[in-house]
Amino acid sequence: MVCRCPRRLQIDFSKVIQEITDDSGKEIEIEEIWKEFRKNYIDVGTSLKYLSHNISSENSSKKTNSDVLKLNVNFKGEEIEINGEGNGPIEACINALSELLHSPIKISDYHQHAISSGADASAAAYIEISIEGKTFWGIGINSNTVAASFEAIISGINKSID
C-alpha cells in the first residue's frame, strides 16, 4: 500500500516519531513507524465506528441538489442511525456528526487517492478536521471512496474524544 500523505499530515506525524525517538534514544524500524501511523490516524479509538451509509439526492426549494445521508454508526457501544444533509456526502456527514456530538466540526483539509488498481481498488482519504479550535487528522481506507472519507472523518473525531 502506498500512502501519499498531505504535507501538513507529514509534519504532524513527524512530531509523533520525533517524540518516540527522543524518548527511546534510538532509531525506529519501518514496522514500528507503520504501527504508529495506523495507531495515530487509521485505527483511532473506539467511541465512534462507521458501519454503513445510504445517500440520496434531493432537489430542494433552492433549486440545487442536496445529498441526504443516513449514516449508521456505533457510538459508545450503541448502533444508531444519524441523518445529515449537505452539498455533497462529506458535508452531509459532517452535519450529521456535528449534531450527534453537539459540537460543530469543520473540514480543514481533504485529500484522496487510489492505493491499488483494478475493479476492487481501494482509496485512501486524508481529512483534517477542526473541533472547538483544535485540529485532528484522520485517514480512511476503503474500496468505496465515500466510505473512506467517512472513516477518515470518524478517525479524526475519535482522536479528539478518545
Task: Briefly describe each language-model feature range.
Residues 1-162:
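Terminal or standalone catalytic/regulatory effector modules within metabolic enzymes
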